[in-house]
């Protein structure tokens, strides 16, 4: 069944300006550190994301080391985005972060250029 978000999803959520950027962020964001890895039930995570969006949450926080295993939360969110939220992509803010050890060796830590390019 195709997902259709709540028509009144923006009526109850409070939104605040982010500095002087003009960007509006919801008062509540959803971080995907827990409950979105390969060890978790995909459909449960999908339901959480969809319900959050129905309630006006437009900011989803990820990182390339979220899982377990590392990266699996981003993969799962990508599937949810593709199948459920793609028509609403312009309404979403998706953030990530850098600086964590991703792989052994001198280029896999602390946000090196090589590490950041591997994410893109």
Question: Where are the regions that the model predicts?
Answer:
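Glycine/proline-rich, positively charged
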Residues: 103-120
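N-terminal binding-site loop/beta-alpha segment at the start of enzyme catalytic domains
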Residues: 1-93, 117
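Substrate-binding cleft and catalytic face of glycoside hydrolase catalytic domains
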Residues: 95-103
């Amino acid at each position: 069944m195709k997902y259709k978000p709540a028509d009144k999803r923006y009526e109850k959520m409070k939104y605040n300006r982010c500095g002087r950027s003009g960007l509006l962020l919801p008062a509540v964001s959803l971080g995907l550190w827990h409950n979105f890895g390969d060890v978790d039930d995909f459909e449960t995570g999908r339901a959480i994301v969809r319900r959050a969006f129905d309630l006006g949450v437009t900011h989803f926080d990820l990182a390339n080391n979220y899982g377990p295993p590392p990266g699996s939360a981003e993969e799962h969110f990508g599937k949810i985005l593709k199948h459920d939220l793609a028509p609403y992509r312009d309404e979403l803010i998706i953030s990530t972060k850098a600086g964590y050890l991703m792989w052994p060796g001198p280029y896999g830590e602390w946000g090196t250029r090589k590490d950041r390019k591997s994410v893109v």
